[in-house]
């Protein structure tokens, strides 16, 4: 499954009302109303929400995604896929 087949879109629409939202899903290149993280060329993120834990994302977390996070970034892991990892400011359901 990808983010289009989950409640992720509802969450993104809600957050997009007051915040700048970027998405990343290895199976989705374009999503109307949102910018793909691949287009991101600015400063770092205040928060990250992992809603669909693709193997590719988890495998590349340190190398590809961690450099995009601010020092005190909050990392929300909706499904708790990374509970066993040591992640600063980690939050899960």
Question: Predicted regions span which residues?
Answer:
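Structural/interface elements that position substrates and couple domains in central-metabolism enzymes
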Residues: 1-93
């Amino acid at each position: 499954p990808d983010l289009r087949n989950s409640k992720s879109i509802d969450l993104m629409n809600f957050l997009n009302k007051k915040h700048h939202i970027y998405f990343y899903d290895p199976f989705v290149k374009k999503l109307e109303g949102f910018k793909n993280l691949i287009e991101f060329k600015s400063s770092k993120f205040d928060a990250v929400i992992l809603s669909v834990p693709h193997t590719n994302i988890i495998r590349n977390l340190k190398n590809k995604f961690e450099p995009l996070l601010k020092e005190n970034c909050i990392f929300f892991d909706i499904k708790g896929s990374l509970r066993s990892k040591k992640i600063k400011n980690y939050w899960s359901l």
